[in-house]
Each structure stands twice: as C-alpha cells, then as structure tokens.
Amino acid sequence: MQAFKKKLQQLVYSFSTEDRYADYDEEAANPDVAAGVERSITESNHGSQIQLADYVDGSNPSGNEGINEALLAWRHIDNWTSQHNPDLAATLSDPCTRHDINNAEKDLDIIFPASVRASLRLHDGQEDLVSMTGTGGLFFGLQLMGLDEIVQMTRTWRNVAENLERKNHELQIKMDKHQELNGTTVDLPNQQKGYGKLENQDYKAMDPNLQRNISQNYKKQFKLPDIPDQHSVPPLAIQQVYANSGWIPLVTDNAGNHIGIDLAPGPKGKYGQVILFGREFDTKFVVASNWGDFLLSFANDLELGNWLLIDEGNDQFAGEGELVFRDKKSNGPVRDYLEVLVMRSRMKWNSFTERKLPEEPKRTVSSSQGSQNTVEPAEQQETALTVDETLDEKNDTSLSVDNTGTKQEVKDPETTGTKTGSSAKAEDNLPKTSNPDEVMADGADTQETSKHEQNESTNAVENTETSQEGAVETSEKPEEKPKKQSKKASKKKGKKDEKKDTDSKTKEPEVEEETESHLANSVEKLKDDFENVAL
C-alpha cells in the first residue's frame, strides 16, 4: 500500500511541478513548486520578470558577476532566433527551477556561479535536435547542454580524472618499491601465476643480466596511455592536466570537446572562467572571464552578422538550415566555432603580453647600441694603424718637399760626423799663424805659399760642399727605408712601435738644430782662418 501511494505521489508530482532535474522527495511533503518562476511566453523570451534573488548567491558576492551580461545576452539571442531561425528557437528548453539547480549542485558537490544559475533559469539547454531536422547546436553547431546532461558529463570526466590519478599513484608506489628492492630481490612487474620473487640463491644461478634487463623495461610495463604534456593559454591560468573534477561542461560538440566553466583554476586563473577542454585539446584555452561574458560575445557575433544558415538538403520541411560561423567583415569561409574561439584567445593573450612588456623593445635597442659602441681591442688596433699610416704618408710627402727645396737640412746624425771630419782635415791643411813676425820675415815666400794655400783651402771648401751634398743625398735615402719598415712594424707590433716612431720623430728636429749650428760654426771658423792666411 505504501509503495502504491509513493508511486501515485510521484505521478502527481511529475504533472504538477516544473522541476526538470529533481525527483520527488518523500521527505519534502510540500515540494517547492511555487518557488519556480511562473513565466508567460513573453517572459520566457525576454526574461524580464526573473528576480535576481532566484539565483544570486548571498554567501559569495564575488561570484555574482556576469548576471546582467547573461540576461542581456539571452534577450538578444531569443530575439534573433525568433526572427531568423524559429526552428532553432524551438529547440531551446524551458527554464529550470531553483529546486533543480539545488539538487544538481548537491549531486556534484559544487555551487554554480550566478551567471550559470541565471542562464539555467532562462533555458535548460536544447532538446529535440534529433527529431527536428535541419537544425543544429545553438552556438554555431555546438549544442547547449541541459542540467541533466551537465551532471552526467561532469561525472564522466570526473571518472577519467580519478582513473588517471589512481594510475599515477599506483605507478609511483611500484616505482618506489622497485627502487627499494633493487639489488636484493627482483620484483617482476607481471603478477600472473608462475611469477614471483626470486631468492638470492636462485638469482645467482640465472642470467646475471636479468636484473638489468628488467629494470630497463620496468617503466614500459606500467606506462600510462600516450597522453602528451598539457598546457594552457594564458599560461598557468588552467591546471595543466588532461581532466579535472572542477571542470563543468556546458556546451558540447558531441565528439568529446566542451566549453565549460572552471571551478578549480590554476595559479593565475579566475574562479568561474570559461574554458575549452576535451579530447582534442591538450592545450586548454580561456575564452571568457565568466559565463555571462561568453553569452554576450556570442550574441555580439549574431548582431554583427557573422553567421550563415546552410541548408544541405532540398527538404522543404527541414527548416531554415544550420547556423554556422562566417566572418562578415572579411567575407571569409565558414569556420568551426571552436577554432574561432582558440584564435581569439591567442590574439587576446598576445595583445596582453605586448601591453604588459613595453620596456622590452627599449632593452633590445640599448643592448644593440651598447654592442655597436663597444669596440674590441683588435678593432681599435686596426683603426689606430690605419690612422698612423695616413699620418706617415703625410710626413713622407712633407719630407720630400723639404729635401727638394733645401738641401742644407741634415736629419741623420751620421752625416754630422762626415762634415766634422772634413772640416778637421781642412784645418790640418792650414798653416799655423800663431806668430805674425815670422810671416813678415819670410816676405815673398810667404805670399806664394799663401796663394798656394788659398787655392788648397778653396778646394777644401768645395770638397766640403760636395761632401755635404752627398751626405744630404745619402741621408735622404736611408730615411725612406726606416719609414717603410716602421709601417710594416707598426702593423705587426701595434702601439709599442708607433710610440717609438713618434719618439724618434720628436728627436729629429733637435738633432737637426744641433747639426746646423755645428756646421755653421765650422764654416765660420774656416772663413776666419782663410782671412787670416790672406792677410
């Protein structure tokens, strides 16, 4: 009798309640049917009569963002679908009740963000997609999931996450045991019949390379399925795992990929952010900060005209066609909406990094300037050698002009030695005139000898002049060789030889002045001696 009574109450409850997910609760004698929002057709299209108290979480004010965006987005979506694709509008389900949402949260042990609650209180996903041909998912072919589907798919992904975590844990335990037993006994990974631990005495009688071979293949026996490394965009915004119990799917492509909310974000993520995850997404993407912003971006695409209705068949009763994405501005081809969301997520992250790092170009410029300004020692030596070579060429030209113009300049101290030697010979040839009385006593003999000596002195002076000219010419020739040698030596030895050349050049004018003064004195002395002899 009690069982029949319970069945009758469940039947009455199913006809009288607006709950779509929650079942009849025997403990609640008076289920909160009135708590569901009574809406007319216009209210279902616009959602204007829904009170915020129906889905606002008073205990978590920070989780209430996105409510206004969700209400505004659904107003535009309902208007657009009723105008352009009534068949698509007919697939949108009736709203959930608060009782449905509370039971779903209890089953999943979560609390939906306020924007998700608002969306479920307007439309509980899509239905009748199979019976209504010519229509597809609301989000450019992606289906909006109902509350019942959300709970079932969340449990499925949680089972995947738990299995992966359990396998990782088992693998870690077995690896630890293998490391402990390595060297004493061999723990074979295969636990079938006929396999077990080998004692030390048995192990010695077997192949000595057995333990090494087992250790090399040990990881292969317990290797997980081929799951590549997981990433996220932006980095660290989403946990880098294949599946997580905090990811709640809300939209599906019916192929294992989802758009959902993240209730367990990464270190740099945000609670309630909208992400892309699934079988084909080893890199997870953040597409919106909350569910309301995502709905508003979809409504914006509809208002901008980024859509097409494609009817692949000729059936007149098939409806207007399936809604697909096409960028109106670029007049591009039809694109998958998941690919569009991935592209937008990458572009948003790239623009964010460019704004966040404005100093990076400056640093590169400064480093390049610094590298240009810094000259290596070898380069400095080469530049110094080229400058010195040009200076040497200028000095060569100036010296050649001086040598051709004035032959009396003497630049080699060796020439001074020849000149002084010739003057000394001339002085030896001259007679001693220290006693004038002897000269007067001799008379005519002295005059003859004086004439003879005068001729000899003039010849000596001419010989000295010719010797001077020869000395100047010889001094000019050896000077060219040291300069050529100094150029070669400066290229090889560098700055040390250059300093020596500059020192020798500074000493040359001093030597020239000394030789000129000494030559002038010797010439004047010869003139005085000649005058005395003549007298």
Swiss-Prot record:
Biological process per Gene Ontology, one example term: fungal-type cell wall beta-glucan biosynthetic process
Pfam family, one: SMI1_KNR4
Region listing for Disordered, in residue ranges: 354-535
Biased composition, class Basic residues, residue ranges: 484-494
InterPro entries for the chain: Knr4/Smi1, Knr4/Smi1-like_dom, Knr4/Smi1-like_sf, KNR4/SMI1_regulator
Compositionally biased region (Polar residues): 364-384, 397-407, 456-469
Biased composition (Basic and acidic residues): 354-363, 474-483, 495-509, 524-535
GO cellular component, one term: mating projection tip
Family: Belongs to the KNR4/SMI1 family.
PANTHER family hit by this protein: CELL WALL ASSEMBLY REGULATOR SMI1
Record's protein name: KNR4/SMI1 homolog
